[in-house]
């Protein structure tokens, strides 16, 4: 079975390959045929054909394809822009061009656009102030008549009442009746009024102002219906009634009485304000509807806000103060306030401080309106009690402090009257305390100011100041044990300033202790500040000695942090000074080789000793490394000269300081021990150009070491050496104005001239190093 399947598969594969090969051969033949046809067509163009054959043949159209050429790019020339040569148009021409189109075509056969345009025009005319008003239509008059007939009969007035209203409006000069009668050519007769208000015969013949005066309830708020005539002076007075939305004006019948009552209130409030009484300013008042007047539309408030009177005009006398209190109660019955009646008086310290015989007091306290009358008796009792206690305090040598504030008003925190004032744990002077808040600005007469003592509603203060009597003239500070002390403007800690006040002492007492006037035996202690105490350190004293070192000894700048010693080499070489030959140390090797010398400065810290006077200069106090006899005070600033032998070995006596033999000399020894190969490798590492000979390389390194001193030459790696040399060289150039100006002006620098300038300052650098510096900083150089 398997063999049959295998044979079938092999036959299918064979037939498929045959079909594929036949298909490929057919495709190849087809492609060759097409290629031949194309070639023949191309060759037919070269075939010679006679005229007869041309007539018999139908030649195919020949299409000629032209090669597109690129347009030559035109060179754009830069030229000035030509101005606009058009003639400026006048405003009339601009308007004519803007309205060239026919605007009436917009409204043609379109009623909606016409209505929209007319509506917009009517809205814009409503806001105008012209006196020409539109007439009320017949439908609107019918609506007014129907609305009036629907009102109750109680609100209808008689002919006499209407006449009185018209007369009152003419006399007062306000009201809508004057608007209706503003046209002198039109006047209302009895028939017009009867038709307008629909009055019957009984109402026309009645003598009373109202048809039902006795039946009307005074508490009822039924309104009177008033309408406008055809002549309206303002667009706001025009009655625009539509079919679905109609309006009418309801005026309260008690407007006249309310306006009159409001005028009375204003006159009374003006009278009380002139007398110096304060009327509280209400934040919100009752406002009613607005009434329209004749030419100028005026707004009249039914209840106007009383004017505010400053606190400095408060309480001129007792009678006026009582009268003011009654007026405030009367206003409170009529005016409904939406804010709590809390009034805080801000006192002026300059005008309200009263000069009393003994101590003066000023209480910084909030004032509430409801405590003005209740605390008057407490004020007088407090003053009497205070005078008695002040007499007793004279025997104990204590008096209350005079607390004077500056001209800035003191604003107390806003608290409600229901809240009790916070009681401070610190006792006030001589027990003059009131549990309730006390007004500060209350006065009996303008000439006399009553000062009240009360607690300050604020956080308890840890310090209380009390002024003593003139016998002791000392100011004491009382504070509690549980509270810390802080430096204030009155208390003085640290370095006291020169003031006219008495010195400050501190008395310790516990909370709730007896009064300060009774506790006269309190302990006096020093003031302890809450800030960290800064320890005082003894000032360091440094002594500087200047020496002249000559011969072969080379001294470098050196710092010894352990012994606080600094050696500094001063400037360039100086000419030798002529010194006494007796003080000169002879040279052991060559006494003639002493042409060169240098000046060094040695600075050392002075250890102060208490047993000696600082003004005296003794040998024990001297910190000079080279003690060449004692110096007088006049010769301290002079330079002491010391000539040493030309040998490298130097003994400086018994000073015990060997800093001159330290790492500075050891570094030179380490460099000298290096071989030529090692020096050449070091030169390559530092970016320097190696030279022939070990001595020459040592000379170059010695010059660089002196130039970058006190930097260690062996500790520098890579480009650090070049950077140190360049930084030092740049610093020297900036210090010399001549060279700095030449470099800033890009003047070519001669390297040899720069080298000579450095040699004059005892700096020895090679030309290669200077050239590398100039190339690095883009400085132009020349060899000529």
Curated annotation (Swiss-Prot):
Residues 73-89 have a biased composition (Basic residues). Residues 73-92, 400-421 are annotated as: Disordered. One of its GO terms (cellular component) is Slx1-Slx4 complex. Its main location: nucleus. Keywords: DNA damage, DNA recombination, DNA repair, Nucleus, Phosphoprotein. Residues 405-415 have a biased composition (Polar residues). It is found in: Nucleus. GO terms for molecular function: 5'-flap endonuclease activity. GO terms for biological process: DNA recombination; DNA repair; DNA replication. Phosphorylated in response to DNA damage. It comes from the Eukaryota. It holds the Pfam family Slx4. Regulatory subunit of the SLX1-SLX4 structure-specific endonuclease that resolves DNA secondary structures generated during DNA repair and recombination. Has endonuclease activity towards branched DNA substrates, introducing single-strand cuts in duplex DNA close to junctions with ss-DNA. Belongs to the SLX4 family. Forms a heterodimer with SLX1. This is Structure-specific endonuclease subunit SLX4. It comes from Candida dubliniensis (strain CD36 / ATCC MYA-646 / CBS 7987 / NCPF 3949 / NRRL Y-17841) (Yeast).
